[in-house]
């Protein structure tokens, strides 16, 4: 019997994953629900989110570097659903690599060099400070910031900032020149 989470997904996603085993990833901090299949990953995100930019960037990166391939991207009134291919291997923060920095550092260095080698003249996604601050302002003004997962010294009585509004003001006033 199909579980209720899978049953609730859009048909375009469900047809790829129906009947397949998965685990739920609890590593990320994005607040998304991430289902890990043997050869695919499904990211379910509350809207609004930046998944459209991520999808556009993933499609643009295809063939340029090893990156997940977008299989299906769907949105409804509440969520966005990104089903992508799964890249096999360990993440850089895996215990294996953290205990073996002499293996990790060269891998990270090669990864940075690979990213730097990409010609970005036709890159469809612009992520500059002005755009990111505008998105942050929208999230703050519309009550879309969840501080429950923030570092303890960021907000509140013992924090550097009273609330997200104060942090946003500080970021706007202290932007690099």
List the model feature ranges, each with a label.
Residues 1-30:
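N-terminal charged segments
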């Amino acid at each position: 019997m199909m579980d209720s989470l899978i049953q609730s997904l859009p048909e375009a996603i469900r047809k790829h994953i129906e009947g397949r085993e998965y685990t739920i990833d609890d590593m990320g901090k994005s607040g998304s629900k991430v289902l890990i299949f043997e050869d695919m990953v499904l990211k379910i995100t509350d809207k609004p989110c930046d998944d459209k930019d991520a999808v556009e960037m993933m499609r643009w990166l295809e063939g340029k570097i090893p990156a997940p391939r977008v299989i299906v991207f769907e949105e409804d009134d509440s969520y966005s659903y990104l089903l992508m291919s799964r890249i096999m291997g360990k993440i850089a923060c895996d215990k294996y690599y953290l205990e073996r920095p002499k293996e990790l550092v060269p891998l990270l260095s090669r990864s940075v060099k690979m990213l730097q080698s990409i010609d970005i003249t036709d890159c469809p996604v612009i992520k500059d400070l002005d755009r990111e601050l505008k998105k942050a302002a929208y999230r703050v003004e519309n009550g879309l910031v969840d501080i429950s997962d923030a570092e303890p010294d960021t907000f509140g009585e013992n924090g550097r900032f009273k609330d997200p509004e104060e942090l946003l003001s500080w970021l706007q006033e202290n932007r690099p020149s």
